[in-house]
């Protein structure tokens, strides 16, 4: 009976699809519900005009909400088998476990160390195309830095350090014991720092699942649980804890402690550099300050309880800073300012939520504080495509501009330049030594006043093409690697779709010619030289760097769509941001700490009280510090129209 009503509607939609929708999406739309097909038609129509980011803020948010809904329905793919039924009681684990287990009561292992990377797009077998075109040719001709291009005043080196700090919290692939060797073809060998290099394959693991038969394990915990500070297992956690008053280890001078081999004692130290170490130090100080505040509020709390509550609070502070401070600077538009704040506070805003609590659904009050977590029927993980779009090494400069913080501030609170320190002196074990000489305060101010690199073609740091990689414990390996070439190879090896199929999978209109990707004539010429006329062969990393950017965005729109989906998922799927975001779990003082922290500046102010007053002129600690602060806009944000 119901089919009498629905069949004519489906026929009508089918005709609309054939006439109005890009042919590449006909099959995808045919598998959608009637409502979702209609929603896709709206999004696709706007995409064809390329105007969503120019819409008034409220309508831009509506577009993004519809697009996110579609991705939640069709771009969350489970890898591996899923247990059935309730597996654990949340009240037995009112804290973040060392290895990420027991967050999801229906799936003990979801988000744990060693769990599978998920997928946003079905894997595309590239075993026969691992060297087509050769990764070292791709890098030499299209990615390697010619001259340093920065982001102007929008994003600084703290911001570049922050995202690596987050990667060390979220993702790292398990390696196999088998090695692969790449050799530079003769046409580019003279321009490659390494003529050949060896590295370990990504370990391929059977999933026991009929659809996606093999997957890759994440050796970090993908929850937003601060594992960059605490580690992803009990062994590392025990090394960083003092087991006194809930605190973590740190020197009297405010530095991380070090092992005899020179490696830092911290949650995750693999392939690190002084910028990440500086942030790890800052958040060890934050954790310990939370412990002091909690103990002052309740002197009966024991070491274990203090640690557990302080970890919850510190992890939430990190997540909040990333959501409403870092990302807002990355995507510097009114629409994304409103959108990211809505993720945390909802459309009703901070003042309403602070006064009345979480009211209604996530649209009105945000994901944080929802009555129950939401994984959209797919166990929580971070995905292969997520790892791909976070390949952001062009953000790194060639040297750090060290500043004199003993001098008087210059114009816009700028400190004088002392010298430039090459990045090779700031990475790995040498970087730990250099940071001890510089000090955290001078390092923070110096990074704050220096613009980071732009995510564009010909801006991948040359010094990363001859890099000493680390073992998981932070010790150095003997074989150097060309990181740029390795990143191109890794996406192919892990069966991540190439750029055009990547876009199709995300319901984004694919390119049909190089001119659709970029207006840069030199780039078009070299793209043709490397890939010929076949746009389907374009590597996703190259496409993300080449793509025309939305005004205000430091990343490509393609990467942003993954952000749109996964940034929400990191909050809404985690019970410690939803059903357990309460005084009972965090304590009254702990919840107050999270709710009153709005930015990285707030954290810096707690541990370096004079620093921002003396040296920070900008509105955010993630934009260049001597920039003028944002001007107050009297127009309510939802009624603003982008310039």
UniProtKB/Swiss-Prot annotation:
SUPFAM superfamilies: Heme-dependent peroxidases. Binds 1 heme b (iron(II)-protoporphyrin IX) group per subunit. Binds 1 calcium ion per subunit. This is Alpha-dioxygenase PIOX. It comes from Pisum sativum (Garden pea). Heme b binds at residues 173, 393, 490, 494. One of its GO terms (biological process) is fatty acid biosynthetic process. Ca(2+) binds at residues 169, 221, 223, 225, 227. The record marks 270 as: Transition state stabilizer. The gene is alphaDOX1. It comes from the Eukaryota. The active site is at residue 168. Pfam families: An_peroxidase. GO terms for molecular function: heme binding; metal ion binding; oxidoreductase activity, acting on single donors with incorporation of molecular oxygen, incorporation of two atoms of oxygen; peroxidase activity.
